[in-house]
Amino acid sequence: MEKFVSTMYDAITQGMEKEFPERVAFRYYTEETDMVTTVLFKELAQDVRRTVTYLQSTIPDAKGKKVCLLSKNSYEYVVNTFGAIMAGCVLVPMNQRKSWAEMSHELELVEPAAILTDGEDYGSKEQLEAAYGSLLHPMDEFRRYEPAAELHPIGHDDLMVLMFTSGTTGLSKGVMMSERNLFSAGQVLWAISAQLADKIDLTKPLPGHYMVLPMFHLGCLLYTSPSPRDSTSSR
């Protein structure tokens, strides 16, 4: 890729599936099996397509509907992030460590069509199930579905992500972000790398680097946006 992609559609169909299908997208450890799983970009893309099928077949008129993610960091979190966006839904990453009062306030504002969760109790599981039980679905539900044969670009300036602030000065505010908002930040980072071309061999993957952030954080959302040129780094 000669430049950072500007749409999620291109990131998946061009980056993951055509240019770098055999490169490593993720490596993650599963405590139950004591194993490290390696996922290639082509495999990640197939799981994203499965999520598109899942959401579009279970949410009536899925376009513009809110899908909340309530989970710890995981491979499934990233799959559902990209899948919800490509299904035309509005992604709502949520801080699972917030109090029920804070969380319920955000959910009332959002009016979600689905809440994807890892099923763990972060302190509000009982209240969550009582209030939104019919909307709760496991994070790995996409695995039961076939990959979508076709993907379609989303509106570049349409609402794509609704991200809540930390609420340090009061109740959390929902920040409305479009595809243009998110990918413009990635293009800035790409431009900085291009200026360092005389110091970095841009034909090779960058050295491994680490970011310790929850996936509901804006910085982590940007970091996990597909950027196959440094895809040999462990995610």
Region spans (language model):
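Conserved pre-ATP/AMP-binding loop-to-beta segment of ANL
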Residues: P21-V24, P147-F164, G170-L171, A197-G208
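Conserved AMP-binding A3 loop
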Residues: T38-K42, M160-V188, T232-R235
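N-lobe entry segment of adenylate-forming
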Residues: M1-T58, K63, A87, E108
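Conserved small/polar residues in nucleotide/adenosyl-binding loops
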Residues: T165, Y223-D230
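Conserved AMP-binding/adenylate-forming
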Residues: M35-T37, V52-K98, M211-P214
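Structural core segment of the AMP-binding/adenylate-forming
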Residues: F82, M86-P153
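Conserved structural elements of the adenylate-forming
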Residues: A45-T53, V175-D201, L206, V212
